[in-house]
């Protein structure tokens, strides 16, 4: 991961044998409550926000969404995924959890100027997305509770 504030690059090992590389067509996307669901650009445009039709972010959903932009070569991303899976289960009836493979969805990453991974979007039903780069799972829970669920 990269810490732009401190101008440092951190390399952290992970077990490549644990990496699951998924290829998903637009018609194969199935989003389930309580899961961290892989999505494509097509799904994003249809159900989250169609940036081709509006420059202002207009969320299409009826439940808050957490979107993880990740890559298989990103150690911090790979360690974050199990934490997000736990959060997806914990908030299964309140928040939808999605993940976007940054290597496969370059256009989507480019549209949002994603320059560091992991980058996580927290999208409330009403309002602008909250974007976090490299924060801790505890910070994510705080954002979900205070911003998305307004607890």
Tell me what each language-model feature is.
Residues 3-23, 27, 116, 121-151:
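Non-catalytic, surface beta->alpha helical segment in thiol-disulfide oxidoreductase systems
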Residues 87-111, 136-143:
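Structural microenvironment flanking redox-active thiols in thiol-disulfide oxidoreductases
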Residues 76-90:
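Typically the conserved alpha-helix immediately C-terminal to a functionally engaged Cys/Sec
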Residues 62-65, 69-73, 116:
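Short pre-active-site segment immediately N-terminal to redox-active cysteine/selenocysteine motifs
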